[in-house]
Design a protein with these regions (language model features):
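Conserved catalytic cysteine-centered active-site region
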Residues: 57-111, 131, 143-150, 218-259, ...
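N-terminal amphipathic/basic leader segments beginning at the initiator methionine
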Residues: 1-17
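N-terminal extracellular/periplasmic Venus flytrap/periplasmic-binding protein-like
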Residues: 10-13, 24-29, 33-34, 42, ...
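Conserved beta-ketoacyl condensing-enzyme motif
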Residues: 22-113, 117-134, 190-204, 297, ...
Length: 403
């Protein structure tokens, strides 16, 4: 089978996902096009250099609707003969774009792809596209639907994680992210966002809160207690599904959950012939990809079974992995992953994660693949695994191996 190699990976800084965020003035198409242009410039791509642009995006309405991927191609300097494909696997959309591109290459359907994703959460509100699982009684009732924050608290309750553990993990994420920026660990991958006059709009992640302490987080109110206990009473729904739970321990709040931000990320993937034709050296190969469906109520446990699946399918064990990126959607997701595999925290999200820098839904999967590769190179390690939990009960994973 043909190998699929990563030749480059880059991302924009993440802006606060509010009207006062630095990227709020930039449209989804413009930011996507800016990143595609940067990828082409960095690798010297001209003409019909890639087979397709596969772009992950979750909230595909308004300016993010109508096949954003194709709109981005047309707004960029890429050749108009390059098509575009927008995909949505919720929070793993960016990863699924990369995985789909890699598997297309392995199957012989093209020599190279640009894959990644975007989410402009300040411009297109999360959930504004609707969701049948949340509003259709024919689906909501039999699946025991609860919002993601309740699901995160169910994980904490089921597996015994405390508020103190979650807050400590969040503080460490902030510390690691601040250190990574101070040591320029992201410099290789960051594409600054400029305005039409060439002036810098944003050149670093702006959501971070360096210096956050456990005492600071202890002052925050649990975000999902009211919707669980008062109206509409989702704790009751959870306990109907899991009658062994006497109550739900609400440990999550804004500080130990992922931040709402704007951002985009891209990965250039190609076969060996593509690299030789363009004078590019491969940085890593995509060794394996996987996705899986899980219980939709607890919803966010997907990283565990999908990691088991990808390791089994690739003939590997957890000990074969040097570094891990587990999306910090909520603290309990990462705590459960480390508990399930007895993985040292020293190997997981070593440069911080979404609790510190934010989670631009459609982009995050591609972001963590790029971050993982950069850190493997910095430490001169070989193999990394990236994984995300996914809304409605799914998981996705990618294993990369330096070459």
């Amino acid at each position: 089978m043909t190998e699929a190699y990563i030749y480059d990976a880059a991302r924009t800084p993440r802006g606060k996902g509010r009207p006062d965020g630095s990227l709020h003035e930039v449209t989804s198409v413009a930011l996507s096009a800016r990143l595609l242009n940067a990828m082409a410039e960095r690798s010297g791509l001209k003409g019909h250099a890639v087979e397709d642009v596969i772009w992950g995006n979750v909230t595909q309405v308004k300016e993010q609707g109508g096949c954003l991927a194709r709109s981005a191609v047309l707004a960029s300097n890429l050749d108009e003969s390059i098509p575009g494909l927008s995909i949505n696997r919720f929070c793993a959309s960016g990863m699924e774009a990369v995985n789909l591109a890699a598997n297309q290459i392995k199957g012989g359907a093209g020599d190279a792809y640009l894959a990644g994703g975007i989410e402009m959460m300040s411009r297109v509100g999360m959930g504004s596209d609707g969701a049948a699982i949340a509003v259709d009684p024919g689906l909501t009732f039999p699946t025991y639907f609860v919002p993601q924050g309740i699901s995160a608290d169910i994980i904490a309750t089921e597996y015994g994680f405390t508020r103190e553990q979650a807050d400590a993990l969040a503080v460490e994420s902030q510390r690691r992210a601040a250190q990574a920026w101070a040591e320029n660990r992201f410099a290789k991958s960051i594409v600054p966002v400029l305005d039409q006059n060439g002036l810098t709009i944003l050149d670093r992640d702006e959501y971070m809160r360096p210096g956050t302490t456990v005492d600071d987080l202890a002052k925050l109110k649990a975000s999902f207690a009211d919707m669980g206990q008062v109206m509409p009473g989702f704790d009751k729904v959870a306990m109907l599904k899991y009658p062994h739970l006497a109550e739900i321990n609400h440990i999550h709040h804004a500080g130990n959950s992922s931040g709402i931000v704007d951002g985009a990320a891209a990965v250039l993937i190609g076969n060996e012939a593509f690299g030789k034709a363009h004078g590019l050296r491969p940085r890593a190969r995509i060794r394996a990809t996987a996705k899986i469906g899980t219980d939709p109520t607890i919803m966010l446990t997907g990283p565990v079974p999908v990691t088991e699946k990808i390791l089994r399918d690739s003939g590997m064990s957890i000990g074969d992995i040097d570094l891990f990126e587990v999306n910090e959607a909520f603290a309990s997701v990462v705590l459960r992953f480390m508990q399930a595999f007895d993985v040292s925290p020293d190997l997981v999200n070593v440069n911080g994660g979404a609790m510190a820098m934010g989670h631009p839904l459609g982009a995050t999967g591609a972001i963590i693949i790029g971050t993982l590769l950069d850190e493997l190179e910095r430490r001169d390690l070989t193999t990394g695994l990236a994984t995300l939990c996914i809304a409605s009960g799914m998981g996705a994973a990618t294993i990369i191996e330096r070459v």
